[in-house]
Amino acid sequence: MPPTQAESVIKNIIREIGQECAAHGEIVPETLVAFMVKAVVLDPSNGFNTDRTLTKSDVQKLVKLCVNRLLDSKNPSLDTIKMQVYFDMNYTSREEFLEEHHQVIESRLSSVSREITDSRACVREELESLYRKIVSYVLLRSGLGSPTDIKIVREATAALQSVFPQTELGTFLTLSKKDKERQLKELTMIVTGIRLFNRDCGKGGEGIDDLPAILQEAIPATTQHVDSQLEVVQEQAYRYTAILEKVAKNPLMSQELQPYMLREALYNVRQCEIFLQVILSDIITCAQEVEMMIKQLEAQLEQLKLTVKSKTAVPTSQVFPIFIALSNLWTSFQDETVLISILSNLTTHLEPFLGAHDLFFPEKVMQVLLDGVTVKTDVCRIKEHIEDKVNVADFKKLEWLFPETTANFDKLLIQYRGFCAYTFATTDGLLLPGNPSIGILKYKDKYYTFNTRDAAYSFAENPENYIDIIREKAKRNAELIQLLELHQQFESLIQYSQMKEVDKRYIKPITKCETGTQTDTHLLPPTIVRSYEWNEWELRRKAIKLANLRRKVTHSVQTDHSHMRRENCSQVYPSKDVGTQSMREGSSRVPRPQIYIAGLRGGQTKTTYGVKVNLTRAVDET
């Protein structure tokens, strides 16, 4: 049958079963019906063959069996399956919840944000209306008061005008849609920070709840409520375990106690215990986060007071980051408040799935069944065999892990939720907690624990046999698939998204042992690269040299037209001083002027008369 046709047939079967149950006054969710259909088909006692197509009679038989099981209100097994379906549909991890919660807030604000970003206001009335919408958006996004309360609106408007006056709407309208959305978020955080600071100073904070104080009161109350529920469930589990342990030792009691469905009741309380432990773990995480955030909030407010102390004006670069940090912290407080509320509601809604215990096992019946039985807690059972350990030398082909030799011992994903595989397989479905101190068996990359050393040795002799027995028991009791985390063996019963979560939690062990190593002095020959250069400029010089060589022409790359070419060169002698000598001197010159003046020594009383005499020789005489 094609996959699409098979899906159509299954949907029709689920719809028909839902209608049948509704006709009997029982409204059953489709998820529960779908799980029940697959569980009934999987049970070998019902005679369905998953390898062949269902006939009309098979479909009628399947519908009848599913309706009967879904209407059996006195069956703890059905309550367990309902509990599992409810928890899977309503519980999400902390990270997923915060992501989904923020997505819901964004979707609710999308219409208001769209009205603001798509606005084309021009006239004064339209701009005033747009500004009022921005104030409403800030209040809705921050969650600090109702936008219909006049006092809250006035306070938010005053805070917004201090950082975003109405005169800046023109600039805001010119921005792109993404920039508008980003600015709206920033304005919301800044206004939220301002209002929180004013509230701390006693100058405002209308409509702002004291979330830190509320959480400090709600978390202990929720923790106490979950703890009390967990104690009740664990006490019931210990009593059922003690009775079933007594039955395992006395097979004659098995027939007498068959109508009581003790085994199914044990599965029911163990499943509830696991869910309550998950919830309690999340609450503890919330408490740790809130404690840390309260310290951060006090530190941010103190820093802000020191920054704005006795100052008329403070740079926005100093206070805006603190306002934004305050807003983010307050958003985290709001997230924790919603998360605590959801976890508390989950705990409350798990209680109705335990109603069959008071009906089947009133206190008088339990006292009779517990006659001569010692009720032991899980801790007591582990302490009884705390000193027993598996001798690794007895197993040559199997690997055993111990706390002393495994680094992440506490983080290993133990098969069957940590219950003893051997005890569950060899008894009538008795769930006893495994003792990791005895040793964890690693078999085919899976890890198994046991309540005693003898159980560990017996299981190790033939692991496949006991694993098959447990698988067959899970087919007959579908609630065991979720309870013992057998998802990988029954992938058809769970969604792919859940399979990814199973793979995500799978952690491989990190084993530790005493080892020693010794290295030779010179294990390998030295590899000194002589051509290595650390200097950048030397590398550049070599690169230039290679680039020049690339342009050179060598014989290996000659062509028909260039193979006769060669480089031309010329040689000259360097210049030097040269002198010559002859036998005769040759020269030429002109007469030297010889002019004299006579009669310069005259008498004292007579006038002196000088006579100029030119004795220069003629040119031709020389």
Curated annotation (Swiss-Prot):
* Protein function: Essential for sperm motility and is involved in the regulation of the beating frequency of motile cilia on the epithelial cells of the respiratory tract. Required for the establishment of radial spokes in sperm flagella.
Q: What is its main location?
A: cytoplasm
Does this entry carry the keyword Chaperone? no
Gene Ontology CC terms: axoneme; ciliary basal body; motile cilium; radial spoke
Example GO biological process term? cilium movement
For this entry, the protein name equals Cilia- and flagella-associated protein 206
What gene name is given for the protein in this entry? CFAP206
The reply to whether Cytoplasm figures as a keyword in the UniProt entry is yes
- Protein's cellular compartments: Cytoplasm, Cytoskeleton, Cilium axoneme; Cytoplasm, Cytoskeleton, Cilium basal body
Instruction: Cite the entry's keywords alphabetically.
Output: Cell projection, Cilium, Cilium biogenesis/degradation, Cytoplasm, Cytoskeleton
What is one Pfam family matched by this protein? Answer: FAP206
Entry's family note: Belongs to the CFAP206 family.
**What is the protein's species of origin?**
Bos taurus (Bovine)
